[in-house]
Amino acid sequence: MIQLSEDQIVKVTGDVSSPKGFQAKGVHCGLRYSKKDLGVIISETPAVSAAVYTQSHFQAAPIKVTQDSLKHGPTLKAVIVNSAIANACTGEQGLKDAYTMRESFASQLGIEPELVAVSSTGVIGEHLDMEKIHAGIELLKETPAGSGDFEEAILTTDTVIKQTCYELAIGGKTVTIGGAAKGSGMIHPNMATMLGFVTTDAAIEEKALQKALREITDVSFNQITVDGETSTNDMVLVMANGCAENECLTEDHPDWPVFKKALLLTCEDLAKEIARDGEGATKLIEAQVQGAKNNLDANVIAKKIVGSNLVKTAVYGTDANWGRIIGAIGHSAAQVTAEEVEVYLGGQCLFKNNEPQPFSESIAKEYLEGDEITIVIKMAEGDGNGRAWGCDLTYDYIKINASYRT
């Protein structure tokens, strides 16, 4: 184990099963043709939990069931997740199936149903095959925990699993935070199809955890966009089981800032991996905005840039077309003074004082041939800073989504 100072946060190899007292599993139950499609995270003790959900008017059945679980109390012992079928827009039967899924898994664990969260992702409007779900739950009982199995089970059109892990010191105790996520298309959260699961062995007050998650989600998961589409099933769930045996964290605790920073890093990692793995994507795009009127304006501008199809296609085509960036900034809802906007790409200034600046097209093109592109916007409206992440738009995005159900 790494020896940590009180203000040190270290990224380590790990996932949602790395914090003490957690295990994760994934199996193939038959919802997908061959890949794993049913995953669970289990805590050995009740975990203080917090969640944020999709803002879609068509919230999926599993979202409603998870909300019901957390209404009964702020603790969970497990979450069960299926891929392939979203169980969204499926009426009363879909809601019944989600509750049955919760009860079946709770029964296997010997716990109250309200201690289980439920999540689904996949095709909208199709019902779950409950025989396969029940068979999968039985299979999970006999399946050993395995690194990466849960992460694989929650994927849909994703091309890679998404996981991260950090360690930090709280009051002389080593605390671990692990994360897993899925998301590739329909990504434009407030919350998009994106699921995030974070586990930690820290002891935390529920109110502080829920507030931190909302604040962090706004500057991480809600600052990514792949295609501007929002899903019915988005959810980010955090479970904190206290197995690190630290003094319970509250907002007034001296170690709260370092824990909150580690939680932010965890969510940022997952958010960027989702953006990087956008359907058909070849490049991660990050927009950094400095000197906006406030942080809200900065985040609005940053997300407008990475969400612009014209910017995304220019990046794919390695074309340093700064006019597309200006176009995105220009129709944002933020306060913008044209003469005070500067645009930088790969260290070169492309635009300043409301006019183009001389720059090397060849150097810009070479920079755009990389797989991580950062666009920097400098303003003089105030002290607001913000970031957002997206990806390029390629021909493969159309191919993937034109045949999504076939």
Swiss-Prot record:
Reaction it catalyzes = N(2)-acetyl-L-ornithine + L-glutamate = N-acetyl-L-glutamate + L-ornithine; L-glutamate + acetyl-CoA = N-acetyl-L-glutamate + CoA + H(+)
Q: Give details on activation and inhibition.
A: Feedback inhibition by L-arginine.
Its principal location? cytoplasm
Q: What is its EC number?
A: 2.3.1.35, 2.3.1.1
Q: Where is this site: Involved in the stabilization of negative charge on the oxyanion by the formation of the oxyanion hole?
A: T121, G122
* Keywords assigned by UniProt, alphabetized: Acyltransferase, Amino-acid biosynthesis, Arginine biosynthesis, Autocatalytic cleavage, Cytoplasm, Multifunctional enzyme, Transferase
Question: Which GO CC annotations does the UniProt entry carry?
Answer: cytoplasm
Pathway this chain belongs to = Amino-acid biosynthesis; L-arginine biosynthesis; L-ornithine and N-acetyl-L-glutamate from L-glutamate and N(2)-acetyl-L-ornithine (cyclic): step 1/1; Amino-acid biosynthesis; L-arginine biosynthesis; N(2)-acetyl-L-ornithine from L-glutamate: step 1/4
Kindly identify the residues recorded as the active site. Answer: T193 (nucleophile)
Instruction: State if Transferase is listed as a keyword.
Output: yes
Coiled-coil spans in chain: none
Name where it's found. Cytoplasm
Query: Which GO biological process categories is it annotated with?
Result: L-arginine biosynthetic process; ornithine biosynthetic process
Q: How does it assemble?
A: Heterotetramer of two alpha and two beta chains.
PANTHER family named in the record: ARGININE BIOSYNTHESIS BIFUNCTIONAL PROTEIN ARGJ, ARGININE BIOSYNTHESIS BIFUNCTIONAL PROTEIN ARGJ, MITOCHONDRIAL
The job of this chain, per UniProt, is described as: Catalyzes two activities which are involved in the cyclic version of arginine biosynthesis: the synthesis of N-acetylglutamate from glutamate and acetyl-CoA as the acetyl donor, and of ornithine by transacetylation between N(2)-acetylornithine and glutamate.
Family statement:
Belongs to the ArgJ family.
Name under which the protein is recorded: Arginine biosynthesis bifunctional protein ArgJ
Q: Which organism is it from?
A: Bacillus subtilis (strain 168)
Q: What would be the name of the gene that encodes this protein?
A: argJ
